[in-house]
């Protein structure tokens, strides 16, 4: 009987350690698996300073909220579309993000920021185009002359690299020669409002993405697990990170820094030097042509 009671007590203690629970200060604790994101760590600090009812702690073992949501079936996540509709409204989420994440009318991950590395082409060569088809790219590439590259790249698993093991091989010289070849596309980062503003004003490169595909991007998302004991509180945190109050934390990070909300994005863009109505329209055309990388 004593063993049975001890086992039951251990089970109850284990269950008590999972999911949302009261903190010593009376606030409900919500657990976040931030997937190693320093940006979200700073957002947690700001949220905890602002919230009187909830406190978020980082916990990978028994989370209520997860970043990314990879590895979780939709049946294990909360459909947050009703919360979106009664909150910021689905029309505020940038269409390409909503389209890429929506599943049969349900939304299991809220996009909070987006951006990333892409490929850009000279605005002069593009001559007003926003994207490049494969045929257009090949035509422009031919005009750059013999030996021109579509874009400079480097790989460690292709046969020609085997000469790196030859005594006479001079990697530095070969790399210098390789990267001095003319190329149609160059690496370009569009991951912050400042970088987007530069591109639509006086930037030399325009993000076309890969020819025939167009510009693609990554995004940072937050999901609520179905096992969460306080979905309302978890949604309060998601809304905080999505909204402008998390800006001081988000803008200190790297990677996905562009707001997922249209109102916030274009308001921030309009604050940048040199961005007029024409530049804003150009930015809208660019964002409307974006797609979410690896979207299901």
Task: Place the predicted regions along the sequence by residue.
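Helix-loop-helix "hinge/cap" segment bordering the ligand-binding cleft or interdomain interface
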Residues: 102-185, 196, 226-232
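Extracytoplasmic/secreted envelope proteins and their assembly/folding machinery
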Residues: 40-44, 48, 77, 98, ...
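Mature extracytoplasmic/periplasmic domains
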Residues: 18, 220-295
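Hinge/lid segment of periplasmic solute-binding proteins
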Residues: 69-118
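Extracytoplasmic/periplasmic substrate-binding proteins
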Residues: 174-248
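Sec-dependent signal peptide recognition
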Residues: 2-10
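Sec-exported extracytoplasmic/periplasmic mature domains
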Residues: 45-53, 85, 102, 122, ...
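Conserved N-terminal structural module of periplasmic/extracytoplasmic solute-binding proteins
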Residues: 1, 13-70
